[in-house]
UniProtKB/Swiss-Prot annotation:
Tissue: Strong expression in narrowly defined pattern restricted to the lower and middle cortical regions of the hair shaft in both developing and cycling hair. During hair follicle regression (catagen), expression levels decrease until expression is no longer detectable in follicles at resting stage (telogen).
GO CC field: intermediate filament
Main function: In the hair cortex, hair keratin intermediate filaments are embedded in an interfilamentous matrix, consisting of hair keratin-associated proteins (KRTAP), which are essential for the formation of a rigid and resistant hair shaft through their extensive disulfide bond cross-linking with abundant cysteine residues of hair keratins. The matrix proteins include the high-sulfur and high-glycine-tyrosine keratins.
Species of origin: Mus musculus
Disulfide-linked positions: none
Induction per the UniProt record: Expression in skin and hair follicle is regulated by HOXC13 and by GATA3.
Designated name of the protein: Keratin-associated protein 19-2
Coiled coil: none
Length: 141
């Protein structure tokens, strides 16, 4: 967390922004301080929240604890355009809890659905590559 402003650029504002957003707890790519990435704002975004807003937006999306980006997405932990809770890489058009890349569910990785899926897979707490297509518990990368 640590309310720390990383780059404070773009059109973001607030505390703990990564590239120009505001929020707390960024995790992916630019791990500096906390918050959204690219112009977005929220809580625990991954790479960027390009115009996004909410809790942990990614790249233009908004949500809670997104992984890489939530390009136009919204919700809890959106990825790349999706919305959900705790997404891994991207939720391009996805929705739900932790959608990945167009997927939906809780903590999905890349287009998966369910509870913490990785890459189109399903399980619990999967984050990204390590859960490619499968399922597991608390796997990060």
């Amino acid at each position: 967390m640590s309310y720390y402003s990383g780059y404070s650029g773009g059109l973001g504002y607030g505390y703990g922004s990564s590239f120009g957003g505001l929020g707390c707890g960024c995790n992916s790519i630019r791990r500096l301080g906390c918050g959204s990435g690219y112009g977005g704002f929220g809580y625990g975004s991954g790479y960027g929240g390009f115009g996004g807003f909410g809790y942990g937006s990614g790249y233009g999306g908004y949500g809670y604890g997104s992984g890489y980006g939530g390009f136009g997405g919204f919700g809890y932990g959106s990825g790349y355009g999706g919305f959900g809770y705790g997404s891994g890489y991207g939720g391009f058009g996805g929705f739900g809890y932790g959608s990945g890349y167009g997927g939906y569910g809780y903590g999905s990785g890349f287009g998966g659905y369910g509870y913490g899926s990785g890459f189109r897979g399903y399980g619990c707490g999967c984050r990204r590559s390590s859960c490619c297509g499968g399922y597991g518990f608390s796997s990060f990368y």
